[in-house]
């Protein structure tokens, strides 16, 4: 059958299709990546979720959060200006240094206002990271500010299937501390000043949200429940996929093959997680059904799902909280079992600092995995998915031992649709609000906004 399909498409003339074309089947709808074949197919069984659409790729905004601060001495580049050599912690991103913006001197003073005298600023750091707002001291009623991702989602969310996508890899449960709700330590995305956006940790549930794995269609067909869940989503849309491949160019067929292969591979890894025993390397972090036993596999799956969401324009705004603030998760595959939070209170112990550096570099290697994938995905006008994205990465705490929010470890990856300079390290006065960077990101993504959080001006030096 595959051979016949190849023969039938060999002489087919490419026809125009919508950027919003979706493949449909029983209980499934599969969004597609950007294809060069144009606008809309008329009179075809292939369904369109939204008609029309610009050929200019949209800007995607993705915000990553890591807890407990970093080892600052190996985070910042030695020299300002062009990035010639990256510091030790950032070296996994060396292949993408021309896409990096490194910053020195950004602060979230709003996180300091209500900090405990002993320096317990975990919840305040996480809360202010994307909001530039002060966490309201209360164990029952939370209040902060709307986050940058949600402001962007409000601006562009009506054009996508999901206004935003919030992901994490650790249970969002956390106890109250020093008069502050534990919610502050487990949320970086805020839809309103009083409504934090919960993140999803289960890759299968994220996959189903993206690709419409809806078992309600069982009752409209003769498909049994066991057959439905055993079938790949690609099996359910294969007829639509075959028709589409007959109507597009050779280049688009190659892109479709690569994309569908990626979807099948991610789906297979999720199914493996569903069928594996419920045990955990970390007794303190019990694993629900559908969560990979291997933590790295969990991280990488979430990266792949974010890439698929951006590639198909299913969403343009996403956050990724790798682990919750003040986590004491350990990383035995790095050669030690000390908890992350315990290590962050290093008291300048060289052994603890070495281990913190290894955790920092490991987290950056996960970011590098996603960045490399985004660099490989072609979009319009010779650009890539990474060209049309801005990925903010950092922590709301600078030094975990001091629990401060001064000179935060922050970097920005991507070119924002060609609007941003990159490949540079900028040093700013130590009183520069990080909100200036968040404001600049929103403006360069096309949001008509003049201030954000405690901003004083858009951060200079980013405009291309």
State what each model feature region is:
Residues 2-464:
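Ligand-binding pockets and gating/stacking loops
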């Amino acid at each position: 059958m595959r051979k016949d399909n190849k023969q039938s498409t060999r002489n087919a003339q490419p026809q125009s299709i919508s950027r919003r074309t979706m493949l449909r089947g029983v209980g499934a709808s599969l969004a597609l990546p950007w294809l060069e074949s144009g606008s809309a197919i008329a009179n075809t069984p292939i369904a369109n979720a939204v008609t029309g659409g610009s050929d200019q790729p949209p800007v995607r905004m993705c915000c990553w959060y890591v807890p407990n601060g970093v080892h600052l001495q190996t985070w910042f580049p030695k020299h300002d200006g062009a990035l010639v050599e990256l510091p030790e912690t950032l070296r996994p991103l060396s292949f993408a240094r021309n896409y990096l913006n490194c910053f020195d001197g950004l602060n979230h003073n709003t996180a300091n206002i209500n900090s405990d005298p002993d320096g317990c600023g975990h919840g305040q750091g996480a809360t202010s990271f994307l909001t530039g707002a002060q966490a309201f001291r209360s164990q029952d009623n939370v209040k902060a500010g709307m986050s940058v991702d949600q402001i962007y989602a409000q601006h562009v969310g009506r054009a996508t299937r999901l206004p935003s996508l919030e992901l994490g890899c650790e249970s969002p449960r956390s106890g109250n501390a020093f008069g502050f709700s534990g919610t502050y330590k487990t949320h970086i995305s805020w839809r309103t000043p009083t409504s934090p956006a919960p993140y999803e940790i289960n890759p299968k549930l994220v996959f189903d949200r993206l690709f419409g794995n809806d078992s309600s269609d069982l009752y409209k067909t003769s498909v049994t429940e066991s057959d439905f869940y055993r079938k790949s989503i690609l099996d359910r849309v294969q007829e639509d996929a075959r028709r589409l491949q007959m109507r597009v160019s050779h280049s688009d067929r190659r892109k479709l093959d690569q994309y569908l292969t990626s979807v099948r591979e991610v789906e297979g890894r999720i199914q493996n997680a569903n069928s594996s025993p419920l045990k955990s390397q970390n007794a303190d972090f019990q694993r629900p059904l559908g969560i990979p036993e291997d933590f790295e596999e969990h991280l990488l799956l979430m990266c792949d799902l974010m890439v698929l969401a951006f590639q198909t324009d299913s969403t343009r705004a996403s956050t990724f909280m790798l682990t919750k603030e003040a986590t004491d998760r350990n990383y035995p595959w790095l050669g030690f079992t000390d908890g992350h939070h315990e290590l962050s209170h290093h008291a300048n112990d060289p052994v603890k600092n070495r281990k913190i550096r290894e955790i920092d570099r490991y987290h950056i290697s996960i970011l590098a995995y996603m960045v490399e994938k985004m660099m490989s995905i072609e979009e319009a006008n010779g650009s890539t998915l990474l060209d049309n994205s801005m990925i903010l990465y950092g922590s709301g705490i600078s030094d975990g031992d001091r629990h401060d929010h001064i000179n935060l470890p922050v970097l920005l990856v991507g070119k924002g649709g060609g609007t941003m300079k990159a490949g540079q390290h900028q040093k700013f006065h130590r009183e520069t609000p990080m909100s200036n960077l968040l404001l600049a990101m929103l403006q360069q993504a096309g949001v008509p906004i003049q201030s954000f959080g405690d901003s004083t001006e858009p951060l200079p030096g980013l405009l291309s």
